[in-house]
Amino acid sequence: MNKAVFLDRDGTIARDVHYCRRAEDFELLPAVPDAIRLLAQNGFKVVVITNQSGIARGYFTEETLAQIHDKMRSELAQHDARVDAIYYCPHHPDEGCSCRKPGTALFYKAAGEHRIDLQSSYVVGDMQMDIDAGKALGCKTLLVTTGPQSPISSPRSLVSSPEPPDHVAPDLLHASKWIIDHS
């Protein structure tokens, strides 16, 4: 079985531009390639799980999303980094699907397809829904404060959360180093 780090996309590995509608608008956050490369070098599968309701809303198509993900993979490859898989939910939040985070269907699909042991894996994201999904899966969870909708302005406010993360990091590189130190 493999261990994995499940990463949110917008606000965690890429700048959150409120519905990234074109590949030209996609921008990796600083040090993300280093973080992803570090995880892979330490034996982790790196899997992106992202909610993309802009498809259901008609803001962009699945073809456009594929172009955005191609750009992401290309930019990572320029730094000798790569993700092992990308899974996305195209549904509107009101549809009630099981694949939209904090739902766990995409995580289970990835775990099955990549022989991932969820108990030895991590979920990293910038929103409480990422933490909730990780907790439901039995993964360790890390909140990064790089997203504009991050639920905290300081780590202390998470103490009262019903499902606080296992760790709060300022960015993905710090999160990756914490994961490696604690795995």
Residue ranges and their predicted role:
Residues 12, 55, 59, 126, ...:
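Gly/Ser/Thr-rich helix-start
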Residues 3, 63, 67-84, 92-123, ...:
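Asp-based, Mg2+/Mn2+-dependent phosphohydrolase catalytic module
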Residues 32, 36-69, 82-95, 134:
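Substrate-recognition element of Asp-dependent hydrolases with the DxDx(T/V) motif
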Residues 1-47:
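Active-site neighborhood of HAD-like aspartate-dependent phosphohydrolases
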Residues 8-10, 51, 126, 130:
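Acidic active-site catalytic centers that drive phospho-/nucleotidyl reactions
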Residues 12-16, 51-53, 85-88, 108-111:
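A short alpha-helix capping/helix-coil boundary motif
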Residues 16, 58, 178:
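Residues that scaffold the ATP/ADP-binding catalytic core of kinase and kinase-like folds
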